[in-house]
UniProtKB/Swiss-Prot annotation:
One of its GO terms (cellular component) is cytoplasm. This is Protein phosphatase CheZ. Its EC number is 3.1.3.-. It comes from Helicobacter pylori (strain ATCC 700392 / 26695). InterPro entries: CheZ_Pase (IPR047802). Changing residue 189 to N: Complete loss of phosphatase activity. Migrates poorly through the soft agar.
Length: 253
């Protein structure tokens, strides 16, 4: 009987009031128990979610580790420092290969520009005699306007000169485009310089970290690390109780 029930009886309360108080008290207890159960379930769910997320981040597939393939950024540890995963090596390869390919592209653009200039010179050589022929046919057509062959030859000569002029213009456009392409290719040299700057910063940072963690004792003379320290959680090791039980079993035999 609670203090409230005792006070009710002392004040002359009847049994109905007493039962009402008991019912109210039981309801409070049940509400408290339900709240505790809900809090426990929520805490358990949060713990499970945390364990799942941590296990996903710390998982590495065995086949990925064996073949040193691509590893997801959410997995740990990162790829081993093999030749294909060394960052500075890859950046050096990029700068070297891009410089070689850029040189080849410049050579091809230079060849295109030189060929366009040759075409323009050849067109000029052809135009000179054709212009003289046009003057001749023009005089003939002026003196003999009724001769149809002179008129036809004059028109054909004019069409040839117009075609040569178009070829000369296209050759000039080709030469200008090759020069513009060479100017645009200057971005490759700028990118190479940026990559080299990044490589130099990374190398300086690597040397700084090596100097920062450098020790006075040589690695060959340094004491090896303990495989197990008291307090570590390792199921493969026997505890003190297991050892005592084993000794006791030998004594019993």
């Amino acid at each position: 009987m609670t203090q409230e029930e005792l006070d009710a009886l002392m004040n002359g309360g009847d049994l109905e009031n007493l039962e009402a108080l008991e019912t109210k008290e039981e309801t409070k207890e049940e509400a408290k128990e339900e709240a505790k159960e809900e809090a426990k379930e929520e805490a358990k769910e949060k713990e499970e979610i945390k364990e799942e997320s941590s296990s996903q981040k710390m998982t590495v597939k065995k086949e990925d580790a064996e073949k040193y393939g691509k590893i997801s950024p959410n997995e740990w540890p990162p790829p081993p420092p093999t030749e294909e995963h060394k960052v500075v090596h890859q950046l050096d390869d990029v700068t070297r290969d891009s410089e070689v390919k850029a040189t080849q592209i410049f050579d091809q653009l230079d060849l295109i520009g030189a060929s366009a200039e040759k075409i323009a010179k050849m067109v000029k050589k052809i135009q000179e005699p054709l212009q003289k022929h046009q003057e001749i046919f023009d005089n003939l057509h002026g003196h003999f306007p009724h001769v149809e062959s002179f008129k036809t030859a004059l028109n054909e000569q004019q069409e040839i000169l117009n075609a040569l002029k178009s070829i000369e213009e296209e050759a000039a456009n080709c030469s200008d485009s090759s020069m513009q392409a060479m100017d645009i290719m200057q971005f490759q040299d700028i990118h190479r310089q940026k990559i080299e700057r990044v490589v130099n910063v990374m190398r300086a940072l690597s040397q700084y970290m090596n100097s920062l963690f450098e020790g006075k004792i040589d690695d060959s003379k340094r004491v090896s690390s303990a495989t197990f320290i008291t307090g570590d959680d390792d199921k493969d090791l026997a505890s003190a109780d297991d050892i005592e039980a084993l000794i006791a079993s030998f004594g019993a035999k």
